[in-house]
Amino acid sequence: MKKLTKISTALLIAGLGFSFAASAKVTVFAAASMTDALQQVAKDYAKQNPKNEVVFSFASSSTLAKQVEEGAPADIFVSASNKWMKYLSEKDLTVKETEKVLVGNDLVLIAPAKSAVNSVDIAKGEWINALKDSYLSVGDPAHVPAGQYAEEALTKLNLWDKVKDRLARGKDVRGALALVERAEAPYGIVYSTDAKVSQQVKTVAVFPADSHKPVVYPVSIVKGHDNADSRDFLKYLESDAAKKVLVGYGFSAK
């Protein structure tokens, strides 16, 4: 399982010279594209709930969903697509009354920050020529939501057949981002929020909204983990304060 990223109260307030022992812990399995935003939300939550602790496991939604299916101790699941939430829901592994869409996102084409290209007409497909002997960096369309959205969009634009054999397939969307950050790929397809948090890439095009299903992030409490602490953090996730943070990171409010 992915190493859990811990947001601990002691670390958050160490600068003030004192700490509290956590009396409750909520484990959140969340799509990799939400890493920065959810960590900030958890920090803000900890300020209001100093005796609570939130820990994260960030990875591809498909990887996390299958870990939940295998019994991983997740209290809350945040997916980057309806597909993987539905996957767990149909297996009766979610608390259905808590299922809802948290935020949305956009799909974008990125290039290294130092690239001479600043914008492209995504529909014309001339940008594909710049790949030359290199690859287009994407989350693996076989299981990564960002890659599946990318395949859908490129198919709609009649470009998929031109690039399907020239893909660098990341294990998640942050893996796809990393290749472009290191300039190991001239272009990549990620979410707008991923591009926004990186100074090593720039957005050169936004895929038309009608070229793919809406990018949404459903959230739910995992069955067997419906308790007061899980409910409390989920309620905070849906609060105006949390939504403000998420929107600040580039997500769209729902």
Curated annotation (Swiss-Prot):
Record organism: Haemophilus influenzae (strain ATCC 51907 / DSM 11121 / KW20 / Rd)
Subunit structure, as described in the record: The complex is composed of two ATP-binding proteins (ModC), two transmembrane proteins (ModB) and a solute-binding protein (ModA).
Gene that encodes it: modA
Alphabetical UniProt keywords: Metal-binding, Molybdenum, Periplasm, Signal, Transport, Tungsten
Protein's UniProt keywords contain Metal-binding: yes
Gene Ontology cellular-component annotations: outer membrane-bounded periplasmic space
Main subcellular location: periplasm
Signal peptide: 1-24
Name of protein: Molybdate-binding protein ModA
Function: Involved in the transport of molybdenum into the cell.
InterPro entries noted in UniProt: ModA, ModA/WtpA
Cellular localization per UniProt: Periplasm
